[in-house]
Amino acid sequence: MTKQAFNYFLLHAGSLLIFSSLLVSCHTKTLDSKTKQVFRYNEHKNIGSLDPAFAKDNADIWAVNQLFNGLVQMDSLMNVTPAIAQFWTISEDAKVYTFSLRKDVNFHSHPLFGDHQTRRVTAHDFVYSFDRLKNPQLASPGSWVLQNVETYKAIDQHTFQINLKTPFPAFLGLLTMKYCSVVPKEIVTHYGTDFRSNPIGTGPYKFKRWEENIKLIFRKNERYFETNSKGGF
C-alpha cells in the first residue's frame, strides 16, 4: 500500500470510530414519541454522494455507513469484526481469503426486486460490487483498495473468495472501508449515476429523501440483520 493510501485508510478508520462514539453519545438526545424515535445529526459539510464507491470523506462516510455493509467492519476498538461475512479463513500462504456469508441479509425494499420488494444478498453481489469498484469507467476514488487483489469469485451463493497477489496482513482492514460495500446490480443498473441519490443497501437505516445541502432523511430498516439482546440495533 502506498503512503497516501495508508494515510487515507487511517482517516477512514478514525472517522468510523468517531461516528460510532457520536451515535452512542447522542443516544440520550433521541426524541421519543408514541410512534417513533428521531435521531438528528448535524453535518457541517455538505454530503457529496450516497454511493459507497465515492465515500471519500467524513460526511460521505458517515451517511453511507448507515445505509451499507461490507464483508467485515471495524468496531469501536478498531478491531475487524464480522458484518455480512459471519466468519472467514485465511490460507497458510496468507493469500487466499474465504468468506462465509450470512443467509439473513436482505437489501432494502425496492419495486425493482419484484413481488417480494427485496432479495437476499449473495456472494455474486460481492463479485458485481468489486467489479464495479475496479471499473475505470466508474472512476471510484476507492479502486486502489483492490490493487493487491489478483482474483475474486463466488464459490457458491454464500461463499466468496479473494486471492491476493502478495500477502498483506492489513487486508481485512482495507475491506472495512465503505468502498467495499455490497450493492445490488439491478438497482445500480437502473439508476446509473443517479444511484448516488437513490441508494439501496443493507444497512441499519434505509434511504427516504435527500434535499441536497438541506436535509437527508433515513428510516429504520426493520429487517436489519444485526440485533442486540432486545431485538433492536
State what each model feature region is.
Residues 2-13:
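Bacterial N-terminal signal peptides that target proteins for export
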Residues 23-25:
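C-terminal motif of bacterial Sec signal peptides marking the signal peptidase cleavage site
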Residues 27-30:
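Bacterial signal peptide processing site
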Residues 35-48, 86, 96-100, 126-129, ...:
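Short, well-ordered beta-strand elements
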Residues 42-92, 128-131, 138, 200:
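N-terminal lobe/hinge region of extracytoplasmic solute-binding protein
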Residues 86-136, 161:
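Aromatic- and charge-enriched surface segment that lines or borders ligand/interaction sites
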Residues 138-186, 204-211:
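Surface-exposed binding/hinge segments that line
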Residues 193-196, 223-233:
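Ligand-site clamp/hinge motif
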